[in-house]
Amino acid sequence: MTATSAAELLDYDDVVARFEPVMGMEVHVELSTATKMFCGCANAFGAEPNTQVCPVCLGLPGSLPVLNQQAVESAIRIGLALNCEIVPWCRFARKNYFYPDQPKNYQISQYDEPIAINGYLDVPLDDGSTWRVEIERAHMEEDTGKLTHLGSDTGRIAGATNSLADYNRAGVPLIEIVTRPIEGAGVKAPEIARAYVTALRDLLRALGVSDVRMDQGSMRCDANLSLKPIGQAEFGTRTETKNVNSLKSVEVAVRYEMRRQAAVLTSGGQVHQETRHFHEDGYTSPGRSKETAEDYRYFPEPDLEPVAPDAEFVEHLRQSLPELPWLRRNRIQQEWGISDEVMRDLVNNGAIDLVAATVEQGASSEAARAWWGNFLVQKANESGVELDALPITPAQVAAVVKLVDDGKLSNKLARQVVEGVLAGEGEPAQVMADRGLEVVRDDSALQAAVDEALAANPGIVEKIRGGKVQAAGAIVGAVMKATKGQADAARVRELVLAACS
């Protein structure tokens, strides 16, 4: 850890004893439309650089934007799901600034007239309580291009010798969701920040408007934070930690920034209004001075008509909303018969939708929970990715469960099959065959292994014959070891007892 070292940070308990944090979350969500916001270029992740561009998204003279209707519908659906008021009239504005990722030198966004306002999202916390986060606005805008900086130790523009611009992302439809100041969180502030982004991600995924892949940048979180002495009404100076790209990092970034700002204030210093970069080893570093609205010189976009959603159409979209996550969880919890604690663990691990999808593919809820809530969570943590970013699908997990249920795999062998799927070796049945992992059930092969184990352990044989049936476990263990775990343990036990009778 560099920047403010760990030794210089104020202890977290001291921070919350002396200061009240005030947070504001800004989440940018790329919409899963077929084309970009204002042109017909493809909206697809991972294409070769600068192959999904045209005069509109490159800002060439004479090009004119045409609004993507699907993006507007997605924005309205998001607003409705967030309990927002959908305004009867809104319009776009030009946000003017100069930076290499913006070929037009302005971004088409919404400034003082967003499409959705005054909403809220009830967020479940780890202790079973709920925190209501108030939504100030949700507005439409276009994304910027992506810059790759070369020659810099940090991968950022400072110290770079060259910068490469990929404009495939320029013009991709975005929804920015902005909260009102979150006050009174106290010691729970970092948890609430993470829980809010988690709940928002789950909601957007349920709506089907975005794949919300934080690791790919389709959901990006900016965390605004200030501290004020307890009892003071006036807010402190805020910082904005940009582009925090995982749920865990949101919590870590807020906690670090609280401790850093507290250390600055208690030493007599001043917190500067600035953007800050989050580093994966858990600290933030200064970015640039934070601009104000005046710096961007907003004015109405002259090339686009205002958007006036028809009330009947808005109501149609409201009625077509899918089952929302909190309603779905209540239903699932009752159907599966699981406790509040188990449900919270599944939600916090990001496993609930994956478990449900695995059950829909034919697995039992118990087996699906065991895989996604334990073994695969461990694999995700080892890989440093979100659970849904692992290269395995609910259908593949369900296929592994079926192989176990059919007696073709033991639980131990099944873990090896899943590891093979994660390594890209193919479907579960193929991995099982290629690795030779299928359970051995042929009596002749098993009998030979049993006879060998019995011959090597005459003392245990005498114990079994003397009535100590539990001693058969040692022979079963020897057979399992000899067959590398592939023997059918239940059948081996039957053969052992039969041989010793």
UniProtKB/Swiss-Prot annotation:
EC numbers, comma separated: 6.3.5.-
Any Pfam family matching the protein: GatB_Yqey
Domain of life where this protein originates: Bacteria
Keyword Nucleotidyltransferase: no
Keyword Repressor set for record: no
Catalytic activity, reaction form: L-glutamyl-tRNA(Gln) + L-glutamine + ATP + H2O = L-glutaminyl-tRNA(Gln) + L-glutamate + ADP + phosphate + H(+); L-aspartyl-tRNA(Asn) + L-glutamine + ATP + H2O = L-asparaginyl-tRNA(Asn) + L-glutamate + ADP + phosphate + 2 H(+)
HAMAP family, alphabetized: GatB
Function: Allows the formation of correctly charged Asn-tRNA(Asn) or Gln-tRNA(Gln) through the transamidation of misacylated Asp-tRNA(Asn) or Glu-tRNA(Gln) in organisms which lack either or both of asparaginyl-tRNA or glutaminyl-tRNA synthetases. The reaction takes place in the presence of glutamine and ATP through an activated phospho-Asp-tRNA(Asn) or phospho-Glu-tRNA(Gln).
Family affiliation: Belongs to the GatB/GatE family. GatB subfamily.
NCBIfam families (alphabetical): gatB (TIGR00133), PRK05477.1-2 (NF004012), PRK05477.1-3 (NF004013), PRK05477.1-4 (NF004014)
Quaternary structure, from the entry: Heterotrimer of A, B and C subunits.
Name assigned to this protein: Aspartyl/glutamyl-tRNA(Asn/Gln) amidotransferase subunit B
Gene behind the chain: gatB
